[in-house]
Every structure is written in C-alpha cells, then in structure tokens.
Amino acid sequence: MNIDKALNVEELRGRFLKHTRLAYRRLPLLEQPRILEIGCGPGQQTIELARLSGGEVVGIDTDPSAVSRLQKRIDQANAGDRIKVIHVSLFDNKFDDDCFDIIWEEGVFHLLDASKCFVECRRLLKPNGYLVMHETILWLESTKIRLPDFGFKLMDEHILPKHSWWTDYGAPLKDRIKAYRDEHGNASNSKKLSQYESVVASIESDPDRSDCGIYLVRRMDGYGQK
C-alpha cells in the first residue's frame, strides 16, 4: 500500500503553500522569471511557483519516484512548455552560468553542505537574482552571518507562525498514523511508516526547533565577498 497516499501526506504539506505564496509576493515584480526549484519532490511548490510567476520553472530532485510523479502532473496539466523536471542533484547539474532569476528551496539546504549550495546558487543566478530558502529559524539564523561571504544579502523574510510544523503537520500526521495502525494492525508495519513516526516524534519532542522562516536573499556582485 502507498503510505503517502493512505496518510494523505500531500494534503498536509499543501497547508504550507500559503507561506510559499506569501514569500513569493515579497519578491520584486519580475516578468516571466526563470525559476529553479531545488528538491522539488512531487511538485506542489513547483506547480504553485509556475502559477504565481507566469514564468518557467525547472524542478530538480534526486528521488526518481518524486520526479516521475511531478512529470505525470506536468503531462496531465499540459504544462510542459512552462514546467520541466530533471532527475539530478544541485551539484551535478549542467545549467549555464547566470541562467535563473530565482532559485527556490524548501527544507533542502540543511541536509547538504551549505557552502557548496551557496557557491552553486551564486553561479546559477543572474546578477541581482534571488535565492529563497525555507528552513528552520535556527538554521537560517546560524547561516545568515555567512551570506556576505558568498556575495548574498538578506533582503526580506517571512516567519511562519510559532509551532506551525507541529500544529499543521506533526499533530495531524500523528493522528493519521494511529488511525492507520488501528485499522491495519500488524499489516501496517513498514519502513516508510516508521520514518514518518520518527519525524513526528522529533517535532513533538521540541516544537521550537522546527519553527521555520523563509529568507529572501539577493545576489549582490561585489558585496562582501572574500
């Protein structure tokens, strides 16, 4: 059984699209921008970014199943002229220098080498382009001081309501997992379900650590670089 579908995890993640919209509206008005989404997954944000921007969105992800799901969405929406998805990592891409107006990531950079991420994003962004990062506030604050070293300047931020990831994601997911186990008994045991239980336990144990924000930083040529 597809655990994601059984738990309707996509609906829970979709609750955070409102923050994607609010953050996007803080950007300056760009006419049909070219956007790169890093770690696009099955594409909820990808589709939303295409709708918000009216431009072209390229999603990249290292998970082939997520790429396949997004490609199916693109085909169903007949949106292949504006949305593309590629199975590749940020560090193995073949994109030209200075080719994106906006780079967007949600919950990816904290899993990677931040320095390498910033170097590659600077290469890919056009001059004065924007990098938008949705991460925990703890990660963002600890990383903010390093932004000038890579030629980036923090321009704006959108802070999510306190404990949003518990209220809108962890708590309802915990209830859905319990209901699923109650219904299916021993047959409910699966690696994916256990992974979700670990995520829920992590958020529940310290909701403050999961509080998130979205930083909008700009490539500034000659600004603060070492």
Which residues are covered by each model-predicted region?
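Conserved Class I S-adenosyl-L-methionine
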Residues: 160-226
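A short acidic, Gly/Pro-enriched loop at the edge of an enzyme's catalytic core
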Residues: 91-103
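Conserved class I S-adenosyl-L-methionine
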Residues: 32-41
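Conserved alpha-helix/loop element of class I SAM-dependent methyltransferases that forms part
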Residues: 13-31
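A short SAM/SAH-binding and catalytic strip from SAM-dependent methyltransferases
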Residues: 102-114
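A short glycine-rich, Lys/Arg-flanked "PGG" loop and its adjoining helix->strand segment in the class I
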Residues: 115-130
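Class I SAM-dependent methyltransferase SAM/SAH-binding core
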Residues: 42-91
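Class I SAM-dependent methyltransferase Rossmann-like catalytic core
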Residues: 2-15
